[in-house]
Amino acid sequence: MAVIEVKVPDIGDYSDVPVIEVLVAVGDTVKKDQGLVTLESDKATLEVPSAAAGVIKELKVKLGDTLSEGAVIALLETADGAAAAPVAAPAEVPASKPPVAPSHRAPAEPPAPKPALASGKPADIECKMVVLGAGPGGYTAAFRAADLGLDTVLIERYASLGGVCLNVGCIPSKALLHAAAVIDEVAHAGDFGVDFGKPKITLDKLREYKEKVVGKLTGGLASMAKQRKVRTVTGVASFVSPNELEIVGADGKTQLLRFEHCIVAAGSQAVKLPNFPWDDKRVMDSTDALELQEIPKTLLVVGGGIIGLEMATVYSALGSKVTVVEFMDQLMPGADKDLVKPLADRLKKQGVEVHLKTKASEVKADKKGVTVTFEAATAGETPALAATTYDRVLVAVGRAPNGKKIGADKAGINVTERGFIPVDRQMRTNVPHIFAIGDIVGNPMLAHKATHEGKLAAEVAAGEKKEWVARVIPSVAYTNPEIAWVGVTETEAKAKGLKVGVAKFPWAASGRAIGIGRTEGFTKLIFDEETHRIIGGAIVGVHAGDLLAEIGLAIEMGAEAEDIGHTIHAHPTLSESVGMSAEVYDGTITDLYIPKKK
């Protein structure tokens, strides 16, 4: 018998990701690719699989631990001579395409399934390119493929294009967050002598406004699809063979589509915890919460990540008494703790209760409401919150990929135990003419990542010699204040032993921030101490997401502190805080007094 270490594989840009569930115990017999622990990032949950079959001899982790790539999860006793299986290399691409390295974001790749034979039936639809899913990544891929001359079909399960993001995600939530921000701003206008009185909320009109915003964007996409001669098909599609898809419409009728190239952009779905009564409409996921069925007097939000906190911001502004419970010891796990503090302080002032290291262990629904019993994250400790009855409960604990819901095995596509589809740096799956993009290929599950991946996949399919070259992917929480970061975080730098310099400019010293009464924020830049190039940055404050792009561009261009500081920023603006942070690092700042080190 041999004992091997099972380690955390490559999980992309994430580090210090908390363990929210241990799925095995010492003595358990596990199969290869069976899940061992579940990790929770800011927007998704990740299940780490076993690299081999065997018996768990020792667990090296417990609930609440934070893990990064390479961390040992368990000691596994395998059969004689057995060892952890190496990650399978992506299938070699055709001779006309240059071979590329596996993506650093791709999950571990299992053995490829044997594809099904072609159906032999006449096709209802034939095309050069089919894109499965019309979210931001999918419609971008379809439009780019059409622009490059490929006869393209775009399949979407919703009646309108845009996927989760436009229909029930990013866009409607930002419309509601704008309304929440206006309510909050009006509430503080009295501080400078302008009193609007208590706002009157007409829920029907607010819902109508949200739907109007969504309609403008989805309608625009439909128009652009027609202009590009992209054929759109509404229905749920699954593979029949490596070159065929079956599409089932809302009326139950099926169509067979035959293609030369395919881009899978089938996205993800909200994780639904098993101990919640999901048949009760008072228990909601993020999609339900965006419907604004009512403004509950009391709302429990389970999960203190980005999605949970954004919806807590909306409902608190609308008048709900909101309670947030988070399993970890900070809100928004994955972000640096200093970024979260201004938000936590403001939520407290607004009356939002936050309970960390707390788990919802039992949930029961009756006529009185939804009663939730809590447990402390640490065994044996008393929970900070007693059993309480709420009008509604929102569960926001991440999203799971849809890789196992599209019949990928019939096309011979590799899908991990968790449901991700591994890809290389050209977004190819192990089947050379099939690509995958967006949430379904791995974290972070962000629309702007999917958009860039979709464009790349379409260009490669059309014959262009390209691969993924972006260094960083930005993250934004549209809370109040907003929290935005890109590149290496302080937490990640510490975990990796990087020698970095950190420079902060407090918005309390910003004329613009003082003028608008929002001085709780700050701008932070992180530099490599050896090269003096910027490798990360973050902003906390109003419009932080809009301000972050300069930092991302600086990282992509390999800028030094001097480059940023010598760029003249308009005054007075919030954006000049980026330049001033660079001056703090460079030691040339005049808008702050920082004693020189002796």
Q: Where do the language-model regions lie?
A:
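Intrinsically disordered, low-complexity linker and terminal tail regions
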Residues: 1, 78-127, 378-381
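Small cofactor-carrier domains centered on a conserved lysine used for covalent cofactor attachment
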Residues: 2-83, 153
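Gly/Ala-rich phosphate-binding loop of Rossmann-like dinucleotide-binding domains
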Residues: 142, 146, 312, 316-317
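FAD-site-proximal beta/loop scaffold in flavoenzymes
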Residues: 279-296, 388, 392-460, 552
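Short hydrophobic core segments
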Residues: 130-132, 237, 256-267, 301-302, ...
